[in-house]
């Protein structure tokens, strides 16, 4: 049996996500994938430039010294720190660490992740400056 009635289709505005703070935050966090894509492509381009010799590397460094690219890279850095901070706050919610029959609070886990990030960053910078 068929009917001629149309099913109700609720309207959806293109800016539906701007009405609630949770959705704005979620879309902003997920939007950080675009600067991450940019960073990945720049690193990939740099690896190929390094592989192709000094002239190619000099061209890559010249490419990166463009003021517009510096601005884009600063935005990418800010987006990366934001993305990292949100994931570090999310990580303790995904794991249950029990110490002496009590659940470990979120703060030590987040601080540990930031501490590990700082240590790894310092080690990488030290190796880069030594070599």
UniProtKB/Swiss-Prot annotation:
It is found in: Cell inner membrane. The keyword Membrane applies. It is a multi-pass membrane protein. Pfam families: Fumarate_red_C (PF02300). One of its GO terms (molecular function) is succinate dehydrogenase activity. The keyword Calcium does not apply. Keywords: Cell inner membrane, Cell membrane, Membrane, Transmembrane, Transmembrane helix. Its main location: membrane. GO terms for cellular component: fumarate reductase complex; plasma membrane. The chain crosses the membrane at residues 30-50, 58-78, 109-129. Two distinct, membrane-bound, FAD-containing enzymes are responsible for the catalysis of fumarate and succinate interconversion; fumarate reductase is used in anaerobic growth, and succinate dehydrogenase is used in aerobic growth. Anchors the catalytic components of the fumarate reductase complex to the cell inner membrane, binds quinones. Part of an enzyme complex containing four subunits: a flavoprotein (FrdA), an iron-sulfur protein (FrdB), and two hydrophobic anchor proteins (FrdC and FrdD). HAMAP family: Fumarate_red_C (MF_00708). Belongs to the FrdC family. This is Fumarate reductase subunit C. The lineage of its organism: Bacteria, Pseudomonadati, Pseudomonadota, Gammaproteobacteria, Enterobacterales.
